[in-house]
Amino acid sequence: MVLYSFIYKPLMENINTENFKIIYLSLEMKAEELFLKLLSIYIWETYGKEISYKELLSRKKGYKLSDEDFKIVEECTPWLNRLEEVVTVYDKTLNADKMYAYLISELSKYGSFEETETRKIYVPNNPNRTILVVLDHILLLRKNKGRTKKEEIDLASNYLITLRNRCGVSPVVVMQTN
C-alpha cells in the first residue's frame, strides 16, 4: 500500500515531466525488487493483468512467464527506462549520518549549496522540481556507535527536516510496526 499511495500515484502523475524526482532510501528491499513491484502495479493499472514481481522474475514455484506476459513486459520497457530516470534508489545499509551525506550528494546534482554570511543555502537548478525523499523504513536504520535506536531515528528525522527547510524536498518516512 505504501508503494501505491506514496510512490506510484505521484510518480504516474509526474513521470513525463522534468519537474519530478524521487530519491528512494530502500532499507527493506533491493532496487530490482522495488522496480519490479512498481512494474507489477503498472501492468495491473495499464493492462488489467496481475503479474507479481516473483512471476516477473519466473521465481514462483512451478511458474514460467508466458509469451503473452513477456510481450507485455517488453511493451513496458519505455516506462521502465523512464522510471529509472525519475527514481534513484539507495539500497544499502544506512545510519542517520550516512543518510544525510548521501542526500547532500544527491541533491548537489539538482542544485548547489552556497554559504551566506549567516547560513548555508541551497539554490536549485530547477525551482519548479519536486523532489520526494522516501525513507523505507526508518526502523531499519543502523545505530551509529554511542546512539540508541531512538536517538538514530530522531537524528534522521532532524536531518530530513533540515533538508526540507533548506532544499525544499518532500520527505516521506515509512515506519512499520508489527
PLM regions with names:
Residues 1-20, 26-27, 92-178:
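P-loop NTPase motor core
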Residues 12-128:
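Cytosolic-facing regulatory segments adjacent to core modules
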